[in-house]
Amino acid sequence: MTWETVIGLEIHVQLNTKSKIFSGASTAFGAEPNAHASVVECALPGVLPVMNREVVEKAIKLGLALDAKINQKNVFDRKNYFYPDLPKGYQISQLDLPIVEHGKLEIVVGDDVKTINVTRAHMEEDAGKSVHEGLNGATGIDLNRAGTPLLEVVSEPEMRSAAEAVAYAKALHSLVTWLDICDGNMAEGSFRVDANVSVRPKGQEEFGTRREIKNLNSFRFLEQAINYEAEAQIEILEDGGKVQQATMLFDPEKGETRVMRLKEDAHDYRYFPDPDLLPVIISDAQMQKAKAEMPELPKEMAARFVADYGVSEYDARLLTASRAQAAYFEEAAKESGQGKLTANWMNGELAAALNKEGMELADSPITAPRLAALVGKIADGTLSSKLAKKAFEAMWAEPEATIAEIIEKHGLQQMTDTGEIEAMVDEVLANNAKAVEQFKSGNEKALNAIVGQVMKASKGKANPAQVQELIKAKLA
């Protein structure tokens, strides 16, 4: 039997506000345990929550970017459950009236473009965390994270492979960091993924029983967890068993999922409207202001890069992976006047060098103006592509040097003396009679071999196009 995997994602996006969603306590990461736990997070008697306006503004931003419906009346609900890191005994969330509904997000997997529908995004507070290490067998409670504002973004179950799920998660991660509503730091828990996975026979309309894998904090773990869980469910069904609805944990060391608890449904949490919070009403004026302040989105910018700078759609997608990358490209392309060549160098040599050194673009020793200067020298014929790579390496090692100084110091000037190049061509032709005969017999590959010999003789300083033209003229 052929099986189909069905995946929906619930992604917790931690909003990068300075204070918490219902109190003025700091959201700064890495403080001493409970340093940022206010009377609200500690649930002391008589304290009341006060809504953080910035949370609503950031939620609207995401809704607009997802081309979603934004509900202008928002009600908060209590999600009741007992856990030590939740002193109130309930989490404030949104059940029936989420701030964002019916959005969509485009993903690219290989050559395929697919739109995933976003069911909803709702505002809620994060819980604290239990600490088990270094307490001699006891468990401590750290409430620093409690009350941190979250947007839980829920997709439709429209992904059919781990690759599609990873592409969706990456697309949302890119979008929330682009909008500057989340820092995207997965290691610190700013972007956490829960994956709902089920399987069904290919062609069956009805969904299988889903299991939810909680708190996946890397794209690699997301892919591994989904693949393992899908295979595990298929094995259960093929052995004649039934998949039980459950909440799962992923063990990255073993690369497998395991049951944490049997899954609860919404009614198990006894949701009801929070009596301490009035409905949040978003005015038409607030909506207009939010629309006016929206930045150019990645898809729009990518289309503009194709139109204005002549780059391919593929390159445009890479260049708009982050706002920093897009800004770097636009600065370098404008300064050099060479959009396509700039894109090639950014997505090629520069990306490879950053990856090798484990560096961010912001820390690159080759700034946008320096890359523009290099690209300009390639465009005007001063540097061949081979010499340009040597110049790039020197620029990386010598961040203060100008391109002119690099060319002078390392002797990278491309040969412009036609007579000198012609003499080299004559010598190579005289010493490679066999290749000459092969070319005259119609073997185009022989021409490349002859050009290669001339480039070797010139130590890479001759212009390959000029060399090729000279050879063809002499052998015509």
Swiss-Prot record:
Catalyzed reactions per annotation: L-glutamyl-tRNA(Gln) + L-glutamine + ATP + H2O = L-glutaminyl-tRNA(Gln) + L-glutamate + ADP + phosphate + H(+); L-aspartyl-tRNA(Asn) + L-glutamine + ATP + H2O = L-asparaginyl-tRNA(Asn) + L-glutamate + ADP + phosphate + 2 H(+)
SUPFAM superfamilies: GatB/YqeY motif, Glutamine synthetase/guanido kinase
Keyword Metal-binding annotated: no
Alphabetized PROSITE patterns for the sequence: GATB
Biological-process GO terms, alphabetical: glutaminyl-tRNAGln biosynthesis via transamidation; translation
EC number(s) reported in the record: 6.3.5.-
Domain of life of the source: Bacteria
Cross-referenced PANTHER family: GLUTAMYL-TRNA GLN AMIDOTRANSFERASE SUBUNIT B MITOCHONDRIAL AND PROKARYOTIC PET112-RELATED, GLUTAMYL-TRNA(GLN) AMIDOTRANSFERASE SUBUNIT B, MITOCHONDRIAL
Role noted for this protein: Allows the formation of correctly charged Asn-tRNA(Asn) or Gln-tRNA(Gln) through the transamidation of misacylated Asp-tRNA(Asn) or Glu-tRNA(Gln) in organisms which lack either or both of asparaginyl-tRNA or glutaminyl-tRNA synthetases. The reaction takes place in the presence of glutamine and ATP through an activated phospho-Asp-tRNA(Asn) or phospho-Glu-tRNA(Gln).
Protein name, entry field: Aspartyl/glutamyl-tRNA(Asn/Gln) amidotransferase subunit B
Gene of this entry: gatB
